[in-house]
């Protein structure tokens, strides 16, 4: 599923102009004494909608007036992505905001956080607890390791986002700093902090990350992806 590509200025405007909502689910006992507005969905004794629209209804409950409120945000500007029609594997617990592009056969594991404007290429895996900041881009058939961070750039609007190429492996807990580009076929070692652009087909490691060798057959074998993990 491809979202419309947004510039930093467009994302800032999107967030700034969005209606801020505190979406809740409320289960109540008794009866509502006032009509339910169109902005609120009522299914039996359950209400879905913005707290500002639901709170007045609860003040007019008849009988025992008991209710339970479930919420996960406050004055949120960006909803979560509708994942129903993605041709990808998204595991429970992944947090993916709206205006994110996820291409075919990508995998997003539990605990991953994908911010607005990020792009994930076909066949790419985002592992457990990895973070893709705003506008971060990952190419095709890459792997972003558990706990890795691709720093986001929404402000300042003039800054460039992180761009990871095709067939790249970013190791666990590595950090790629704002504006850095990692070339196709390269490997970022676990725990590395990448502060400068990385050319194609090299291995970088350390803090700050430096080139330690070119990709060879042994490295390719160690970093090969498993297609079966991307089957749907």
From Swiss-Prot:
Keyword annotations of the record:
Acyltransferase, Amino-acid biosynthesis, Diaminopimelate biosynthesis, Lysine biosynthesis, Repeat, Transferase
Keyword presence, Transferase: yes
Per its record, the protein catalyses: (S)-2,3,4,5-tetrahydrodipicolinate + acetyl-CoA + H2O = L-2-acetamido-6-oxoheptanedioate + CoA
**PROSITE patterns on file:** HEXAPEP_TRANSFERASES
The keyword Transit peptide appears for this protein: no
Function (record text): Catalyzes the transfer of an acetyl group from acetyl-CoA to tetrahydrodipicolinate.
Q: Which family does it belong to?
A: Belongs to the transferase hexapeptide repeat family. DapH subfamily.
Alphabetized NCBIfam families for the sequence: DapD_Ac
What is the recorded name of this protein? Answer: 2,3,4,5-tetrahydropyridine-2,6-dicarboxylate N-acetyltransferase
Coding gene? dapH
């Amino acid at each position: 599923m491809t979202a419309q590509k947004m510039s930093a200025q467009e994302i800032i405007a999107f967030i700034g102009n969005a209606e801020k909502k505190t979406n809740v689910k409320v289960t109540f006992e008794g009866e509502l004494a006032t009509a339910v507005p169109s902005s609120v969905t009522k299914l039996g004794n359950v209400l879905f909608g913005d707290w500002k629209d639901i709170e007045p209804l609860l003040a007019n409950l008849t009988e025992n007036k008991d209710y339970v409120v479930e919420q996960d945000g406050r004055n949120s500007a960006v909803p979560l992505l509708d994942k129903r029609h993605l041709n990808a594997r998204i595991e429970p617990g992944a947090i993916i905001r709206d205006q994110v592009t996820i291409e075919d056969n990508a995998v997003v594991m539990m605990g991953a956080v994908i911010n607005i404007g990020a792009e994930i290429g076909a066949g790419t895996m985002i592992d457990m607890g990895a973070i893709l900041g705003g506008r971060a881009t990952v190419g095709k058939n890459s792997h972003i390791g558990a706990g890795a961070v691709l720093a986001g750039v929404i402000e300042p609007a003039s800054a460039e986002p992180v761009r990871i190429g095709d067939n790249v492996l970013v190791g666990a807990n590595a950090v790629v700093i704002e504006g850095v580009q990692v070339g196709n076929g390269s490997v970022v070692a676990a725990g590395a902090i990448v502060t400068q652009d990385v050319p194609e087909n090299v291995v970088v490691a350390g803090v700050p990350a430096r080139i330690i060798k070119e990709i060879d057959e042994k490295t390719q074998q160690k970093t090969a992806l498993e297609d079966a993990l991307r089957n749907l």
